[in-house]
């Protein structure tokens, strides 16, 4: 049964025009919410989809998670393929996309592994817009064998080489691939995982079109974390990197 929607779009939306993005308001239009841990603000895929694709284009999100990108693609009249290894995530995605509106795109949801999306032909996708897990910082399942959120950083980066190769294979020449990645800290030192992923995609053949800093608003320097930041002499990570790659 389709949901009753009270608000279809964000208020006073303007396309971002610089390389620092900050969205204190998570976004509560359509079916969006912040209940899926680690999901990105809908302002991010909205900006990316509007800037790097056209109505009727085919968009791919192979780490679909809570379904934010699916909802935005449908609202913006793009067709989208959403993939995830997690059946719970896919069920949530189906619920989130269960609405009707004129001039909406179609949503295709499929269980699958981002390292092998062979059901998609070569050079068939117009835009890739995705938000992978950051290794095992947040684990999204307990026992799914192909879940990359179970992997430690070195193993995760090795598997992301396969993801990058598949992205390059399915994306049309001249089109764009956008990926949000974060870093982590281990034993008191920064692990620049995002830049490792950037290099992996460059090695796969992509050119870096944009490097955007995205501010995190769930990282409050209060209480427990503020105390430990001072006590153990480390800074709280309050940003992520949004890479936009170009397939020439």
Question: Which ranges hold each PLM region?
Answer:
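Class I S-adenosyl-L-methionine-dependent methyltransferase catalytic core
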Residues: 1-248
């Amino acid at each position: 049964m389709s949901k009753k929607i009270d608000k279809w779009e964000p208020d006073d939306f303007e396309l971002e025009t610089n390389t620092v993005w900050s969205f204190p308001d998570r976004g509560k239009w359509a079916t969006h919410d912040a209940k899926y841990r680690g999901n990105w603000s809908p302002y991010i895929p909205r900006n990316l989809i509007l800037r790097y694709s056209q109505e009727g284009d085919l968009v791919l999100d192979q780490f679909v998670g809570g379904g934010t990108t699916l909802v935005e693609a449908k609202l913006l009249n793009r067709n989208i393929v959403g993939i995830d290894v997690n059946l719970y995530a896919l069920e949530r995605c189906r619920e989130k996309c269960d609405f009707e509106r004129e001039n909406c795109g179609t949503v295709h949801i499929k269980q699958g592994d981002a390292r092998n999306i062979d059901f998609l032909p070569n050079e068939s996708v117009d835009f890739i817009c995705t938000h992978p897990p950051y290794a095992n910082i947040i684990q999204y399942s307990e026992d799914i064998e192909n879940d990359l959120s179970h992997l430690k950083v070195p193993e995760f980066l090795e598997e992301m080489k396969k993801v990058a190769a598949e992205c390059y294979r399915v994306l049309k020449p001249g089109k764009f691939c956008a990926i949000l990645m974060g870093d982590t800290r281990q034993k008191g030192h920064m692990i620049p995982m995002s830049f490792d992923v950037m290099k992996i995609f460059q090695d796969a053949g992509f050119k870096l079109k944009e490097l955007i800093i995205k501010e995190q608003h769930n990282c409050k320097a209060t209480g427990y974390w503020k105390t430990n930041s001072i006590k153990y002499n480390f800074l709280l990570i309050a940003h992520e990197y949004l890479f936009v790659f170009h397939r020439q």
